[in-house]
C-alpha cells in the first residue's frame, strides 16, 4: 500500500461506517413498514436446500461471519484454489471433445493442446455414459457418437497416449460409471509413471445427467 493510500485509510473507514449506519436505518424503516402489512400465514419460505429465507438481504448480512471465507488459496477454498486467483494464472481453457475410438479422440486432444489449450474435457459416448461396453447389444448404433467410446483400461490408455497426465488437468463428464472411469484414469496415469498425487482435474458423478 502506498503512502497516499495509507494516509487516506481513516477517511475511507469513516465513510464506510457512515454508509453502514445509513443502511441499518434504512433496513429498520423497511422492517417497520413490513410489520404493518399483511402476510400469508402458515407459509414457510425456504430455498432448494430447505434452509429458511429472510424476507430480504443486504450488505449487512455479509458482516455475519466473514472470517469463514478464508483467503484465496487456503481452506475452505471459498475464494478459489489459487492464492493469486486469475491474476497469476488464467482459468483452464478446455474444449468439450470426444468422438469415435479412443485413438480418434487422442489425436484430437493432441491437436487442441498443440494450439494452446491448457486442459482436457472428455465427452463420452452414450453407451459409456450408461455403463455399457461397445459390444453390448444395447450399444448398437450409438458407439462413438456424441463422445468417445471407453470400454476398458486399454481404451483409457489409448485415449491419453503421449499426453503426460501430470502436466494437464482433465475434466470428465460421466454418469453412474464415474468410479470405474476414475479408476481407469488413475491406472492409465500409473502406467505412465505418474502418481495419483500429481493428477489434476474433476470427474462428474451425476446419475441423472442423461
Model-inferred region functions:
Residues 2-210:
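Catalytic alpha/beta active-site cores
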Amino acid at each position: 500500500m502506498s503512502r497516499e493510500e495509507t494516509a487516506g485509510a481513516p477517511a475511507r473507514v469513516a465513510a464506510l461506517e457512515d454508509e453502514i449506519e445509513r443502511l441499518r436505518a434504512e433496513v429498520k424503516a423497511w422492517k417497520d413498514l413490513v410489520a404493518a402489512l399483511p402476510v400469508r400465514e402458515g407459509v414457510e419460505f425456504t430455498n432448494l436446500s430447505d434452509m429458511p429465507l429472510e424476507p430480504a438481504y443486504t450488505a449487512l448480512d455479509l458482516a455475519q461471519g466473514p472470517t469463514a471465507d478464508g483467503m484465496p488459496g487456503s481452506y475452505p477454498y471459498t475464494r478459489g484454489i489459487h492464492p493469486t486467483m486469475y491474476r497469476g494464472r488464467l482459468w483452464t481453457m478446455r474444449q468439450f471433445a470426444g468422438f469415435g475410438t479412443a485413438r480418434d479422440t487422442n489425436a484430437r486432444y493432441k491437436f487442441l493442446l498443440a494450439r494452446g489449450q491448457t486442459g482436457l474435457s472428455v465427452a463420452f459416448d452414450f453407451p459409456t455414459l450408461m455403463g455399457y461396453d461397445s459390444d453390448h447389444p444395447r450399444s448398437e448404433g450409438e458407439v462413438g457418437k456424441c463422445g468417445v467410446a471407453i470400454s476398458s483400461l486399454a481404451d483409457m490408455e489409448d485415449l491419453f497416449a503421449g499426453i503426460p497426465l501430470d502436466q494437464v488437468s482433465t475434466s470428465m463428464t460421466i454418469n453412474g460409471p464415474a468410479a470405474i472411469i476414475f479408476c481407469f484414469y488413475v491406472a492409465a496415469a500409473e502406467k505412465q509413471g505418474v502418481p495419483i498425487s500429481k493428477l489434476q482435474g474433476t470427474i462428474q458423478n451425476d446419475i441423472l445427467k442423461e
